[in-house]
Amino acid sequence: MPKPIRRIVTGHNAEGKSVFLSDEPSRFEFNVGRGAVTVTELWETRSSPAENFGSEETVDHQFGILPPKDGSIFRIIEYLPDRQRMGEGYDREAAFRAMGAEHALDRANPRHPGFHKTDTIHYVIVLEGEIYALMDEGETLMKAGDVLIQRGTNPAWSNRTDKPC
């Protein structure tokens, strides 16, 4: 089980001064695929440019993999080691269905059951541990501090260690 993610949200008071609106562990944690992946939603925007006034919670819905049209999602994902995550009884169809992403699943790629494609951009930062980023052609090992800019590609993630990433 991952440690709670502290989420601090700022905003404005009635006089337009900057203030802290909340400072607490994120309440929006979702377990996908028998708990093999834990997703912590931190913030969501629903337009661009983002609406920065008001104090409403933006992560107030059921988990889904895609952001709203013209919006963005900031999340932290923890991957268990592959042998735990995709061990006996792993059902990738069910895992992607739980994320509302069965349409993104690449059923034709035999290299890894996690291959999927969306037309979104992802900024992937490894905070702890290590994980392989797999593309249709090639793979690279990412370690803590590494950043990957994923531009509408067909990725899969492989944690070949014995610790979560």
What is each model feature region?
Residues 1-58:
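N-terminal leader/capping segments at the start of a protein or of a new domain
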Residues 14, 127, 160:
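Short, ordered coil/turn segments that flank beta-strands lining enzyme active or ligand-binding pockets
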Residues 26, 75-118, 151-155:
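Conserved short histidine dyad/triad with adjacent acidic residue
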Residues 47-64, 73-78, 86-89:
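Terminal, intrinsically disordered low-complexity segments enriched in charged/polar
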Residues 64-69, 115-116:
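Short, charge-rich binding segments
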Residues 69-73, 80-82, 132, 139-144, ...:
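Ligand-binding loop in jelly-roll beta-barrel domains
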Residues 110-144:
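A short beta-strand-loop-beta hairpin characteristic of the jelly-roll/cupin
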